[in-house]
Amino acid sequence: LQEDINKVDWTAGYAFAAYREPDRKIVNSILDETKTDLPNYYVSDPMRYYQDLKDHGVSLAANYEHKFTVSDKFAPVLDGGVYGEYKSRTFDARRFGYNLLGKGYDRYADWDYAGLFCDENISADRIWMRETTTNSDSYTSENILGAAYVSAKLNYGEALNANIGVRMEYYNLKMDGYSSDGTTPVHLDNRTSDFFPSVNISYNLSAKHLVRAAYGRSVNRPEFREVV
C-alpha cells in the first residue's frame, strides 16, 4: 500500500485476571449496653469465606484509512475497521458458619476470639462448624462483542470541518447461575444489535468565531459483577 494514501493497523490482546481469597474470617461483635463499667462484647455469626474468580479476555482489531485528493482544498479521508472481543468468567465461593448455640460453654463470657474458638469449645454440644454454601455462590458467564465502523472526514479548506460515521455492534451476554436463594436455576442469553451514528460539523466564521453542530449515540454495557 502507498503509505501516503493508505494506512492499515491491527492490534491483538489477551488478558487474564485471577482473585483468590483462601480463608476470610468474619466475626461480628455486639456490645452489651447493660453494663456501664467496661465495654463487654460478645460474638455473633462468625463465618469463614473462600473465593476463587478467574477472568479471561481476548480481543482483535483492524483499521484501514484511505486518503483521497480531489482538489487543493478538498481531500477527504475514509476510515473503516472491525473489532472483536471475547470475555469469560468463572466464580466459585464456599461459606462456613459456626453454630454458637451449644450449652456446654458460656457464650456470653468475656472471651477473646482466640479463647472462644479454642479446641475445648469445638464439639457437638458446644460450637460446631456447618457449611452454608448455596448454589447462588457460584456462576459462569461470558460475552461476545463484534463491531464494525465506517467514518469520513470531509474538510473543505480551513473553513469547514466535518466528521461523520456509524458504528454497528453485536453483543451477546450469557450467564448460568442460580437465584439469590439458591433454588432456581438462572440462564441468561441476551443478544442485541445496535447502530451508533455520529456527526460533528463546524464552520469557522473568523479566526475567533465558529459555529458547531454535533450528534452522537453511545451505550454503557454492564460488567459481569453488575449482572449477577
What is the predicted function of each stretch?
Residues 12-13, 51-61, 67-228:
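Structural signature of Gram-negative outer-membrane beta-barrels, strongest in the C-terminal barrel
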Residues 1-77:
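Outer-membrane beta-barrel domain signature, strongest for Gram-negative TonB-dependent receptors
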